[in-house]
Swiss-Prot record:
UniProt-listed GO biological process terms: viral budding from plasma membrane
Single GO molecular function: structural constituent of virion
Cellular component GO terms held in the UniProt record: host cell nucleus; membrane; virion membrane
Motif annotated as Nuclear localization signal, chain positions: 101-105
The protein's name: Matrix protein 1
Residue segments, region RNP-binding: 165-248
Major site of localization recorded for this protein: virion
Keyword Iron-sulfur: no
Biological classification of the source: Viruses, Riboviria, Orthornavirae, Negarnaviricota, Polyploviricotina
Top-level division of the source organism's lineage: Viruses
Topology of the protein relative to the lipid bilayer: Peripheral membrane protein
Region of interest: Membrane-binding: 1-164
Length: 248
């Protein structure tokens, strides 16, 4: 895969699946695909995207700025504050040393990536801020290599947190993780589905999940609750028993 293709993949790995991710992917392919775009407008779009966290906005915004190092746009607080606000004085010092000494000697994406892998996330965040403020001092390959290494670390942290919740010893947490996943799927289907059948199915899924949440489920007597829910759904013609059996 190309340099820009790798960067798009790492940036998208930060975000959760959904309609917002699909829209972001389309934008990234346009920006990194060689089409001319207005940097200021692109940064405003990223800044106002509600489905992104502050760190995600900062990383995506910085990557777009790296594409146009000669553009003299004003420094954006939504990029600098998350990058400089994490970690301790010691980790920030490590990030500064990394940027000023090691990364200045790098010449390739993979060299920068391998060096960045050996540093903690907070140091890499500060290193990226230094690169963002001094974009002309580093090659695009080095800046994107450092950014992608950080994206991999962030995506790994998110994956571990998600897996921990999915394997939680608390039944309520595991059940809600399944509910949230199902609800996100239903909302995406409803928002992006073009056929009436798809939208109808999405609405039924959301209705079913709403009923399950309203009635709740007992840790000790989940089977009885499941039977009660199926009976309610049958009487109200709101859905199928397969969904109930899966999520209770």
């Amino acid at each position: 895969m190309s340099l820009f293709g790798d960067t798009i993949a790492y940036l998208l790995s930060l975000t959760e699946d959904g309609e917002g991710k699909a829209e972001l992917a389309e934008k990234l392919h346009c920006w990194f695909g060689g089409k001319e775009f207005d940097l200021d407008s692109a940064l405003e779009w990223i800044k106002n995207k509600r489905c992104l966290t502050d760190i995600q906005k900062a990383l995506i915004g910085a990557s777009i700025c790296f594409l146009k190092p000669k553009d003299q746009e004003r420094k954006r607080r939504f990029i600098t504050e998350p990058l400089s606000g994490m970690g301790t004085t010691a980790t920030k010092k490590k990030g500064l040393i990394l940027a000023e000494r090691k990364m200045r000697r790098c010449v390739s994406f993979h060299e920068a990536f391998e060096i960045a892998e050996g540093h903690e996330s907070s140091a890499l965040l500060y290193c990226l801020m230094v690169m963002y403020l001094n974009r002309g001092n580093y090659s695009m390959q080095v800046k994107l290599g450092t950014l992608c290494a950080l994206c991999e670390k962030q995506a790994s942290h998110s994956h571990r947190a998600h897996s921990r919740a999915a394997r939680s010893s608390v039944p309520g947490v595991r059940r809600e993780m399944q509910m949230v996943s199902a609800m996100n799927t239903a909302k995406t289907m409803n928002g992006m589905g073009k056929g009436e059948d798809v939208q109808k199915l999405a609405e039924e899924l959301q209705s079913n999940i709403g009923v399950l949440r309203s009635l709740g489920a007992s840790q000790k007597n989940g089977e009885g609750i499941a039977k009660d829910v199926m009976e309610v759904l049958k009487q109200s013609s709101m859905g199928n028993s397969a969904l109930v059996k899966k999520y209770l």
